[in-house]
């Protein structure tokens, strides 16, 4: 009896797809079969897009966003407010706020949130680089757009404490962000209201 149902290459494709968020083994099998059936219109363009991403996409050295240029297109956009930095946990949160089109400011991606139980401390996050940006630039406001989770709020308080000696206003998102909620799952209107109703810490 064969080790593989449909060949090792297909099994490998299924295993890789199953690692994606929201895809379990069954969904990965369905996705793999769909890609194979649509080889010319889906599988080949997907392969080309993945290869292009491998070759051209990188992390912005200023804010931590992903882009094909460094600094990224947000950091090089002269129409944005240079005095305000929106701090987010992950790139998905940055994208969610950009979709809401509420504030043309700069961003800073932490790369996660403080979680001692998971071994994630300040040194594992981009907090030192945030402080460096505040020191080197005329920043007047830091908006802490972290998720309304225990870890997110712990991260917000830690950053507030680290910036307490700087002449910078620190605010956070308010109305519309439910406790325990994550930014990437909120609709654009809710996010817009949250940004406009931000409060002091």
Swiss-Prot record:
Cited NCBIfam families: recR (TIGR00615)
PROSITE patterns: RECR, TOPRIM
Pfam families in UniProt: RecR_C, RecR_HhH, RecR_ZnF, Toprim_4
Sequence ranges assigned to domain Toprim in this UniProt record: 83-178
Keyword field: DNA damage, DNA recombination, DNA repair, Metal-binding, Zinc, Zinc-finger
A single BP term in Gene Ontology: DNA repair
Family: Belongs to the RecR family.
Name of the gene encoding the protein in the UniProt record: recR
One Gene Ontology molecular-function label: zinc ion binding
Function: May play a role in DNA repair. It seems to be involved in an RecBC-independent recombinational process of DNA repair. It may act with RecF and RecO.
Name listed for the protein in its UniProt record: Recombination protein RecR
PANTHER family: RECOMBINATION PROTEIN RECR
């Amino acid at each position: 009896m064969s080790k593989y149902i449909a060949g090792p290459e297909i099994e490998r494709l299924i295993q890789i797809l199953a690692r994606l968020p929201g895809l379990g083994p069954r969904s990965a099998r369905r996705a793999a079969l769909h890609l194979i059936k649509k080889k010319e219109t889906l599988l080949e363009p997907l392969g080309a897009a993945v290869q292009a991403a491998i070759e051209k996409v990188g992390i912005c050295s200023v804010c931590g966003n992903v882009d094909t240029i460094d600094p990224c297109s947000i950091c090089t956009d002269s129409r944005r407010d240079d005095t305000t930095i929106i701090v987010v946990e992950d790139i998905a949160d940055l994208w969610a706020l950009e979709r809401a089109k509420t504030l043309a400011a700069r961003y800073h991606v932490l790369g996660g949130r403080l979680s001692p139980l998971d071994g994630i401390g300040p040194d594992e996050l981009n907090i030192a680089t945030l402080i460096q940006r505040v020191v080197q630039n005329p920043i007047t406001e830091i908006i802490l757009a972290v998720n309304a989770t225990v870890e997110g709020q712990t991260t917000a308080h830690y950053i507030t404490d680290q910036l307490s000696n700087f002449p910078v206003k620190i605010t956070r998102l308010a109305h519309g962000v439910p406790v325990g909620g994550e930014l990437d799952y909120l609709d654009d209107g809710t996010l817009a209201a949250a940004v406009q109703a931000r409060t002091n810490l």
